């Protein structure tokens, strides 16, 4: 079938793509490898974000809690090599050798393999280890294929339903994996990078793609005709949030200035009007789709929209408009904040521009800086911002521990590189340490809620809202369902519609 019209053989998908490489250990590129149906991990997440078997059929923690043993299914890599305990061991060791982020997730001691089992020993007890191994960073690859295949350009040899035929940032062509352990619904798939949301919607309307991921709020109405389109839409487990740089010398180092900034912003209106009710307005650090007392935390949330109080807080912090230009100043310097954003997601520029307009009303100047997604990570780790917005998964291991640590646990000499903000709170760190060793789910939940309370009471972060997420497909396709977990787009569940 030609790639320009619908065919039973070829699935055509329109996506956003930030990856210019398919090396799963580089940056966050493993996400695309998994989203494209090429890579799989030991563990998969169900619709409530609970770990379930994938390459591993079962797992068990040792009585001393210092190791976990995984039993590996008898399956093959796409090149026909068997997925053995030893192959899994080498793949995880490769991730640790190449990705500093792995070490930040859990402290590996060593790994042993025996037949179809792998035992992972950690330097301290890790309650969420199975979930962590569901992260795309830990896609299981055939390390013996390195050198024969360029993982960067051709993708890794893994176990997913599809293999990479050709890859560029703009377009990826996939073929069915001949060694997949189940039926692969399509012979081919074409993934088109269409970063502009309205262009993505247009491609779906015109029938240039069969499936599109994350259609913008303003375009959803175009796909209401159920005879032509199926809309799969759910509450995501994401936050759109701005990290706030609280480093010494930065204006936001003062908690009163942080509170004033947050209280100057009418998030209800942004989510209801600008984003046409496809977002729940922000507050607590974790979204309402997760079971962490969202309602209780919302009730006690201190920085609700209150521009008059925001002005008062700025005055208390010594910021006054002495020269009548509408911007408050202190020691001869205006209160001017750099807001870094990228345009790959429709809502980010909207939130950035709305922030600029509302903050100005209380005397805060916001300078908007639009950057490419690929430089965002570096800007974040170096702390080169006052506000840095992103659309972020709050559970990266079926549990929010990694997320809560990544941005707000104290970064001691590079111990937590993702926290470039300078945020450091001893009570928060103590709870984080306690959480790391807690295996009881009810107690974990309590600790996490306490951590959230500290974040909101110290105005540590600005959560704009919690997005819904969607996948829309044409009538040529069946079972194109979006999952709460954002790693699964092209799966073996998406099939041609039976006519």
What are these regions (language model features)?
Residues 14-63, 71, 93, 157, ...:
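N-terminal lobe/hinge region of extracytoplasmic solute-binding protein
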Residues 50, 134-184, 188, 307-308, ...:
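Gly/Pro-rich hinge or "lid" segments in bacterial periplasmic/extracellular proteins
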Residues 64-67, 103-145:
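Surface-exposed binding/hinge segments that line
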Residues 265-296, 347-356, 380-499:
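Detector for C-terminal structural segments
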Residues 320-395, 469:
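Ligand/substrate-recognition segments at binding pockets and active sites
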């Amino acid at each position: 079938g030609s790639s320009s019209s619908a065919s039973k053989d070829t699935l055509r998908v329109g996506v956003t793509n930030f990856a210019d490489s398919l090396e799963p250990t580089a940056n966050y590129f493993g996400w695309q490898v998994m989203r494209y149906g090429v890579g799989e991990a030991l563990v998969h997440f169900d619709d409530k974000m609970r770990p379930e078997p994938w390459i591993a059929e079962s797992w068990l923690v040792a009585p001393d809690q210092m190791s976990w043993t995984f039993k590996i299914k008898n399956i093959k890599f796409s090149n026909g090599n068997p997925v053995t305990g030893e192959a899994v061991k080498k793949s995880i060791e490769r991730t640790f050798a190449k990705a500093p982020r792995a070490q930040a997730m859990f402290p590996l001691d060593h790994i042993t393999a025996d037949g179809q089992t792998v035992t992972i020993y950690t330097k301290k007890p890790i309650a969420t280890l199975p979930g962590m191994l569901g992260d795309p960073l830990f896609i299981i690859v055939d390390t013996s294929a390195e050198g024969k295949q360029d993982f960067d350009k051709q993708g890794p040899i893994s176990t997913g339903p599809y293999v990479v035929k050709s890859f560029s940032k703009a377009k990826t062509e996939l073929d069915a994996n001949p060694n997949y352990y189940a039926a692969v619904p399509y012979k081919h798939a074409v993934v088109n990078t269409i970063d502009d949301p309205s262009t993505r919607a247009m491609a779906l309307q015109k029938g240039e793609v069969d499936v599109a991921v994350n259609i913008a709020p303003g375009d959803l109405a175009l796909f209401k005709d159920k005879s032509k389109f199926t809309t799969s839409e759910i509450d995501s487990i994401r936050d759109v949030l701005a990290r706030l740089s609280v480093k010494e010398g930065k204006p936001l180092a003062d908690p009163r200035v942080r509170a004033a900034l947050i209280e100057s912003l009418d998030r209800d209106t942004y989510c209801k009007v600008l984003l046409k009710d496809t977002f729940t307005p922000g507050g607590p650090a974790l979204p309402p789709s997760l079971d962490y007392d969202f309602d209780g935390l919302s009730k006690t949330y201190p920085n609700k929209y209150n521009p008059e109080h925001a002005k008062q807080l700025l005055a208390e912090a010594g910021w006054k408009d002495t020269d009548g230009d509408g911007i408050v100043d202190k020691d001869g310097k205006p209160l001017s904040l750099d807001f870094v954003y990228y345009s790959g997601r429709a809502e980010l520029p909207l939130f950035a521009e709305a922030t600029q307009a509302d903050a100005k009303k209380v005397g805060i100047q916001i300078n908007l800086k639009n950057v490419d997604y690929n430089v965002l990570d570096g800007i974040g780790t170096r702390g080169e911002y006052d506000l840095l917005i992103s659309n972020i998964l709050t559970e990266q291991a079926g549990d929010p521990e990694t997320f809560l640590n990544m941005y707000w646990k104290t970064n001691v000499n590079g111990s937590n590189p993702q926290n470039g903000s300078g945020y450091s709170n001893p009570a928060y760190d103590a709870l984080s340490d306690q959480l790391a060793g807690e295996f009881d789910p009810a107690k974990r939940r309590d600790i996490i809620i306490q951590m959230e309370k500290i974040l909101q009471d110290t105005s540590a972060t600005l959560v704009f809202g919690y997005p819904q997420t969607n996948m829309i497909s044409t009538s040529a396709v069946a079972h194109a369902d979006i999952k709460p977990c954002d790693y699964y787009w092209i799966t073996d569940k998406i099939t041609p519609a039976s006519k």
